[in-house]
């Protein structure tokens, strides 16, 4: 009956990050620089791994896959956020909102599985080096990638299944700069308390569960290497430091958002910026630019590009 008294929502209005002109200018510069750096860094990694024979190994295949996903991660919400910074009316269509939610959860799901695959790769390399190439065969790497995409898409469709049949008849204001599923559910015309709980439990359980799987695997790797090598402890710590740093950067913000009992709008926005802009930029820095082989490969790629530009 209430639906007859309201028009169906066809677009959503973002409140954005801040109304301060100075902070908006700072965010514009900060976000634009990091976005361009993220795109450039991750493309360089994918291109280097694809073209350089020295990097045709399971570890770099997984790194390139992660960089490809990070290209999506920084492109789902960042361009729209940058475009809207100085706009008075920040709107997104209903279809655009659904698309944002879909790709956010696909990217998140795929990246979680890839991080588990990379932890397994490091376990085999450190604990079973003689069997590394046998276990981490091309077939195994492709299987990891197929599972990652299957689970990522399945998780996203599962989340959207809660949403597509809901009626939105007003209000249409989201206190954010992107379409966040928990906030969007609160705008539905019907009572969505149970639905919000299920979505939070689903995302929170996946984040926390994957994080603890990775944590346990790292502890097991450290213990195994320390046990079988006199200098194993420091070697393992050095090898796993990059992986654990990226895991903390990736899982920290969503775990904080989905597991705390009392949401805070400003804190959520800060964490969302961190997750959307900073994490995809830091991943290539932490994972690969500290790697001598990767740095050498990127230098070779850059030299080839310079030579090609001069010739053309």
UniProtKB/Swiss-Prot annotation:
Residues 50-57, 121-139, 220-235, 290-312 are cytoplasmic. Pfam families: 7tm_4 (PF13853). Residues 1-25, 80-100, 159-195, 259-269 are extracellular. The chain crosses the membrane at residues 26-49, 58-79, 101-120, 140-158, 196-219, 236-258, 270-289. One of its GO terms (molecular function) is G protein-coupled receptor activity. Its main location: membrane. It is found in: Cell membrane. It comes from the Eukaryota. Disulfide bonds join 97-189. One of its GO terms (cellular component) is plasma membrane. Glycans are attached at residue 5. Keywords: Cell membrane, Disulfide bond, G-protein coupled receptor, Glycoprotein, Membrane, Olfaction, Receptor, Sensory transduction, Transducer, Transmembrane, Transmembrane helix. It is a multi-pass membrane protein. Belongs to the G-protein coupled receptor 1 family. Odorant receptor. This is Olfactory receptor 4F3/4F16/4F29. It comes from Homo sapiens (Human). The gene is OR4F3.
